[in-house]
């Protein structure tokens, strides 16, 4: 896989989080937004994966395409999403990280290996679960 583009964005509480901070972990990057129905539909699946593998080193970074901070925070809280969250709060067309990862539609997910390289992208549902299962069996 090619190296995952490096980025740093802001968390809801104003801290910075960079992808390189999570090196050494398998990282799932989930591009989503509070206004995206299919994204919210996929969350229970992402949540199940997180609950199963976080203790074994899986990290998830939700990169939100929201431009309204309050909507973003409410969606995180309502859906009970306890992993890392970041956003530029510039929306999909102006988010620099969306450009880096060629995000033109969401949800879009990337799996990044411990070495910082892209393992897979665009998996959802059962396919996503199977791929994560496989990575943790190795």
Cite the ranges covered by each PLM segment.
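Thiol/disulfide oxidoreductase modules built on the thioredoxin-like
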Residues: 79-81, 88-137
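N-terminal "domain-start" segment that seeds a small globular fold
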Residues: 1-20, 131, 137
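Structural microenvironment flanking redox-active thiols in thiol-disulfide oxidoreductases
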Residues: 41-79, 90-99
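Hydrophobic, well-ordered secondary-structure elements that form the walls
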Residues: 29, 72, 85, 116
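Flexible loop/turn segments at secondary-structure boundaries
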Residues: 16-17, 35-38, 67-71, 93-95, ...
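Short active-site neighborhood of thiol/selenol oxidoreductases, capturing the structured segment around
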Residues: 18-40, 46
């Amino acid at each position: 896989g090619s190296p995952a583009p490096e980025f740093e964005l802001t968390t809801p509480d104003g801290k910075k989080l960079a992808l390189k901070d999570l090196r050494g972990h398998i990282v799932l990057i989930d591009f989503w937004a509070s206004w995206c129905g299919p994204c919210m539909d996929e969350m229970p699946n992402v949540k199940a994966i997180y609950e199963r593998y976080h203790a074994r080193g899986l990290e998830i970074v939700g990169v939100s395409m929201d431009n309204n901070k309050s909507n973003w925070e409410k969606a995180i809280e309502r859906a009970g999403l306890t992993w890392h969250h970041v956003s530029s709060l510039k929306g999909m067309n102006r988010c620099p990280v969306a450009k880096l990862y060629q995000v033109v539609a969401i949800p879009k997910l990337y799996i990044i290996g411990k070495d910082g390289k892209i393992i897979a992208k665009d998996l959802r549902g059962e396919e996503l679960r199977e791929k994560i299962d496989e990575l943790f069996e190795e």
